[in-house]
């Protein structure tokens, strides 16, 4: 008796699943709606383009003399034939940065180094040794292409890299 009641309850429950609550099926004979959808207008797209960010940073304009009033200078046209290369940042600047960690540890960071980063480390140590009076403490990360130097030497290293032609 209980099994028969349970079976009947399950059949009623399954029949309810077949129905979709709150939705109705459209008949096959019904045609497309009279709504045309959307109209594409090319005339106003110029206003949309103004809102979209540019996909690439534009090349800097040509100037009559360098460095510019802001101090920017382009890389030398024939690139230096060194075993390493320091690529410019996306804003066309030399990627040398100041970094402070742990509240008082001052570091200078050279990023975007391609090629023999160990040769760059050796050249940087030779350049900074007379300024410091000792060999600077450096850290090389070959995977990320970065060179860290203990202390703030960003202005000296930027001038040195510009002099080398990067």
UniProtKB/Swiss-Prot annotation:
It comes from Mus musculus (Mouse). One of its GO terms (cellular component) is mitochondrion. It is found in: Mitochondrion. Pfam families: Img2. Belongs to the mitochondrion-specific ribosomal protein mL49 family. Component of the mitochondrial ribosome large subunit (39S) which comprises a 16S rRNA and about 50 distinct proteins. Interacts with OXA1L. One of its GO terms (biological process) is mitochondrial translation. GO terms for molecular function: structural constituent of ribosome. This is Large ribosomal subunit protein mL49. Keywords: Mitochondrion, Ribonucleoprotein, Ribosomal protein. Coiled coil: none annotated. Residues 54-77 are annotated as: Disordered. It comes from the Eukaryota.
């Amino acid at each position: 008796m209980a099994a028969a009641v349970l079976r009947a309850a399950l059949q009623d429950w399954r029949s309810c699943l077949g129905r979709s609550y709150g939705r109705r099926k459209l008949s096959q004979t019904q045609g497309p709606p009279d709504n045309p959808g959307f109209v594409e207008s090319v005339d106003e797209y110029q206003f949309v383009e103004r809102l979209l960010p540019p996909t690439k940073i534009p090349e800097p304009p040509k100037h009559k003399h360098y460095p510019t009033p802001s101090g920017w200078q382009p890389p030398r046209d024939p690139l230096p034939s060194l075993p390493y290369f320091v690529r410019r940042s996306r804003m066309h600047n030399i990627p040398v940065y100041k970094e402070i960690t742990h509240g008082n540890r001052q570091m200078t960071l050279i990023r975007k180094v391609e090629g023999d980063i160990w040769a760059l480390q050796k050249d940087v140590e030779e350049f900074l040794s007379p300024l410091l009076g000792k060999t600077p403490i450096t850290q090389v990360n070959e995977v990320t292409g970065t060179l860290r130097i203990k202390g703030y030497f960003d202005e000296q290293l930027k001038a040195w890299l510009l002099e080398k032609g990067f």
